Amino acid sequence: MLKVSCLFVLLCGLLVPSSAQQIPPEVSSQITDALTQGLLDGNFLSLLNAINLEGLLNTILDQVTGLLNILVGPLLGPSDAEIKLQDTRLLQLSLEFSPDSKGIDIWIPLELSVYLKLLILEPLTLYVRTDIRVQLRLESDEDGKYRLAFGHCSLLPRAIELQSGNPLSLPVNAVLGTIENALGNFITEDLGAGLCPTLNSLVSNLDLQLVNNLINLILDRANVDLSV
């Protein structure tokens, strides 16, 4: 039987993208604090528990079974596999201006470990760092009033690294790249599809004053004159 499980913790840390477009901390702290509190109040990390890891495990099994059968003989089946997420951490959020100065990018960094067991292979633990990038775009209506619109939302894997203090066996070396690629695709596609709608809802319900502050930041950055 497939074994799928998740374990979550919160970590106050720092993992932000390096960019010359960073908003000054004294300006962005109020906004990132509100967003972080919204994520916690909305049990954002627990939403990962609903992500279908069984689909990821089946994908990995489909892709590595043939090669493992050649290397170690026919021995792999669904009942011989286990996958689980461990030690998921929400790190320090950050804001930056979009490159065209017409919006704001919210960066939500996550860290997690993926435990994977494929029958006789030694258990693997892969350390993952990924950023969720949420783009807020400045738009104006027919009356010239500005608003923030939820733009593109994506997960960008920063690193997928095997945690192992011992030399890897030949079978593990042979399939490691395939496993890492499958995990990267899962993060980009499935994880993003599961988490981005929640982020859209969170941003849509931000305090009006915070939204106005963001709009003013973008307008100032773009040197747009606004008559109130």
UniProtKB/Swiss-Prot annotation:
One GO BP annotation of this record: surfactant homeostasis
Compartment(s) of residence: Secreted
GO terms, molecular function: lipid binding
Tissue expr: Found in sweat (at protein level).
Source organism superkingdom: Eukaryota
Posttranslational mods: No sign of N-X-[ST] acceptor site even though reported as N-glycosylated.
S-S pairs: C153-C196
N-terminal signal peptide: 1-20
Keywords: Allergen, Disulfide bond, Glycoprotein, Secreted, Signal
Gene Ontology terms: cellular component: extracellular region
Summary of the function given for this chain in its UniProt record: Major protein in sweat, has surfactant properties. Has a role in temperature regulation by having a capacity to make hydrophobic surfaces wettable and so can function in promoting spreading and evaporation of sweat.
Entry similarity comment: Belongs to the BPI/LBP/Plunc superfamily. Plunc family.
Matching PANTHER family: BPI FOLD-CONTAINING FAMILY A MEMBER 1, BPIFA4P PROTEIN-RELATED
Name of the protein in question: Latherin
Species name: Equus caballus (Horse)
Name of the gene this protein is made from: LATH
